[in-house]
Amino acid sequence: MRIINLFILSFILLPLSADDHKVMPGGEVGEFHYIKAKNPLAIVAATDKFIASDCGQKWQAKSRGLVLMQLDGSGMSHFFYSGFDDYESMNEAIQLASSCAAGLEFVQAIGDASHGEYYFNRIGELSLQKGDWTKDSVFLKYDLFVDPMKRGDYAKAWSSLVESQDTPGSSGLVTHVTGNGRVSHFAFNGGPSVPELMSGAEETFSSKEFLEFAAEVDEYRTVVNVMMVTPVKAWVKE
C-alpha cells in the first residue's frame, strides 16, 4: 500500500489542517477515464510500459500521478485517474501523450484490453476535502446530480455534515467540469478497511446530522449510484 499512499499524498495541493474534521479546498483538477476491462493484467502492463518510456516520464513530470482504481457496483470495472495542479499542466500532459508513439501505443493497448464501446471520461475538480487520504485503502463513491442553481448550497450542507462526523478516513467532493449532464458531482468517503468504511457509513446515515442534511438537499440532489472503489496500482514521480 505504500505506493498508493504516496500517490494519494501527492494529490494534496494544500497542506492538511492538523484538525482532520475541517473541510478544506482541494485545489486540484484531474481526468477520470472509465473502462470495462477484458484483461486487467494487460492494462497494468501497458501502463507500466508507457510510464517507463521517455514520453511517459515526461508526461509524469507534468502530473501529480496516475492511479488505476477498481469499481464495484458499476457497469464499468475500473477507472484511471490522473491529477494535475492546474489546467495548464493538464493541457501540456495531454498534448505530450497525444503526440508521441508511446502515448498512442498505450491508448491502443488499453483499447485492446477493454471493451472500447463502454469507455467514457470526465474532467473534474476536487472542490472540497477532509482528512488524510494516505490512511485509506478503500472508498465509497457517490455519483450525484445537483441542481445547477443549488450547487453552492449543496457544498455548504455537505461540508457541515462531513465536519460533524467523527468517522475514520477522508471525505471529498469532486465537481465534474465535463461529462456532467447526468452526474454533476461525486462525493467520497474513505477508510482503512471495508468493515471500518461500512461501519462509518452506517454511523453517519443514522445520525441526526444526516437526517437534517437529507431533508435539506432532497429536493435538489439526486444520488445516481453508489460504488466501492479500491486502488489497484499507482504510478507517481520518484
Q: Locations of the language-model features?
A:
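Hydrophobic h-region of N-terminal signal peptides that target proteins for export
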Residues: 9-17
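Short S/T/G/P-rich N-terminal loop/turn motif that feeds into the first structured element of a domain
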Residues: 18-238
